[in-house]
Regions:
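Acidic metal-phosphate-binding loop of nucleotide-sugar-dependent transferases
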Residues: 39-41
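Acceptor/aglycone-binding surface of glycosyltransferases and processive sugar-polymer synthases
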Residues: 11-26, 31, 43-124, 128, ...
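Anion (oxyanion) recognition and catalysis
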Residues: 2, 54, 139
Length: 169
């Protein structure tokens, strides 16, 4: 769609982190936003991400589904507590308060993508989702990370393809 400057890029089904990489590399904008395809976070929420980053509130705007009380059917109890655990662990490791490490909704400058990828390669960081790599890279390079609350709804598209695997080094 030329009016809205939207491109649709078909990936090869290799997972979220590769799909995000493909999307970022094919984008033309100054900023990049990530929104998971299940639409459990609504597209309309991206306006607040753009506003936050464009006025300089942060270098990485990270969606947080855990600031507001999630819709009862939106997140399994195991996932909720797992997200809480990872947020606390990564907050402790990074000395940066993060309330949700696995919310797929994020916004950053496109030029920062190369820095995130360099961090991943230099540290042999393997993250199947890409969220941890983005967060750790931003913290490592001293970026201002801002959690932005989002409403999290029951998915309206597809079924999860995520397996319960942990990232590793």
């Amino acid at each position: 769609n030329k009016e809205l400057n939207i491109k649709i890029i078909k990936g090869k089904g290799y997972g979220k982190s590769r799909a995000v990489d493909l999307g970022v590399r094919n984008s033309d904008g100054y900023y990049c936003a990530i929104l998971d395809a299940d639409l459990a976070v609504r597209m309309e929420d991206l306006n607040s991400f753009y506003s936050a980053i464009s006025i300089g509130n942060g270098d990485l705007i990270n969606g947080s589904r855990l600031i507001y009380t999630p819709n009862r059917d939106s997140m399994k109890l195991f996932n909720y507590f797992g997200n809480q655990f990872f947020a606390k662990l990564i907050s402790y490791i990074s000395s940066t308060k993060i309330t949700d490490t696995l919310c797929g909704t994020k916004c950053f400058k496109k030029s920062d993508w190369e820095i995130f990828e360099e961090f991943r390669k230099n540290n042999n960081f393997k993250d199947i989702w890409g969220d941890f790599n983005i967060i750790f890279s931003a913290v490592y390079y001293g970026y201002k990370l801002v959690d932005l609350p989002v409403r999290y709804y029951e998915r309206i598209s597809g079924e999860t393809k995520m397996k319960r695997r942990f990232f590793y080094f």
